[in-house]
């Protein structure tokens, strides 16, 4: 069985400008990458990716590579990606979960939170594989922190997922905590296998970013935002499959930005001399 989240049923109260800016930055950098030759891309990954051995000081880049100071690559790596599926998956998860977290943190706090989670993810990877010379790239670790924040603040939000069971495809609603905890368990079970492989998926970076998100969310959330809020109404998660056309309609409604309704101000004139003699005049 396999399932992939597509969008949530959790509208926001503001434009997610930081989320969009982060997505735009990653996409722009990726298109710059694909315009390069393969050797140029690899050089870029070593210059701006987080290379554990270089960060720990046990190795150094060749003189021909002029990258950032090693400490800065703990953050710069989040804007690099290794392929179309890599960036598509990361941007999908940031699109789904980032806007709500930004809404509950605010613009400045959200971007600081995102970058700290990214740095925590790369540090986790460096500490687990200090002698690795493979560059760490991708926004997965930072987005894992965003997913942790979503789990704490919106555990019961409905997430529309596409579920594949053998040859059958179903569109169902699942609670956010089921989707996110399932993802977390997958990272935990897969992490040990990455210890014996140079390169590949950096599962410990994902776990490090997620843990950072759990720790930082209570600090970065807006005042009054509850952690794991109690359900005010009975859950209405839809387990029964629905047709694809309904999913399309739900998606459009979820991200449609309705015009703000302006409430007209009622101007009340001061009572005139003639009105003052009227017994029904409220100003009398």
Regions picked out by a protein language model, each given a short descriptive name:
Residues 1-271, 278-282:
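A detector for small-residue-rich transmembrane helices and their helix-helix packing motifs
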């Amino acid at each position: 069985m396999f399932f992939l989240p597509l969008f949530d049923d959790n509208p926001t109260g503001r434009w997610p400008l930081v989320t969009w800016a982060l997505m735009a930055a990653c996409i722009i950098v990726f298109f710059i990458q694909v315009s390069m030759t393969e050797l140029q891309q690899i050089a870029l990954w070593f210059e701006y990716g987080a290379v554990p051995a270089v960060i720990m000081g046990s190795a150094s880049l060749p003189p021909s590579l002029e990258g950032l100071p090693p400490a800065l690559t703990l953050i710069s790596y989040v804007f690099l990606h290794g392929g179309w599926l890599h960036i598509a998956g990361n941007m999908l998860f940031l699109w789904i979960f980032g806007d709500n977290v930004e809404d509950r943190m605010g613009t400045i706090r959200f971007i600081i939170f995102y970058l700290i989670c990214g740095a925590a993810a790369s540090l986790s990877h460096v500490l687990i594989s200090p002698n690795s010379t493979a560059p760490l790239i991708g926004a997965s670790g930072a987005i894992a922190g965003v997913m942790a924040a979503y789990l704490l603040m919106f555990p019961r939000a409905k997430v529309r997922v596409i579920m594949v069971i053998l040859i059958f495809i179903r569109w169902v609603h699942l609670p956010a905590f089921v989707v996110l905890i399932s993802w977390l368990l997958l990272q935990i079970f897969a992490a040990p296998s990455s210890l014996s492989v140079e390169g590949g998926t950096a599962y410990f970076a994902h776990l490090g970013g997620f843990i950072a998100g759990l720790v930082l969310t209570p600090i970065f959330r807006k005042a009054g935002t509850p952690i794991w809020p109690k359900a005010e109404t009975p859950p209405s998660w839809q387990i029964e499959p629905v047709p694809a056309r309904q999913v399309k309609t739900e998606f459009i409604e979820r991200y449609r930005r309705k015009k703000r309704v302006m409430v007209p101000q009622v101007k009340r004139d001061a009572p005139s001399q003639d009105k003052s003699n009227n017994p029904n005049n409220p100003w009398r």
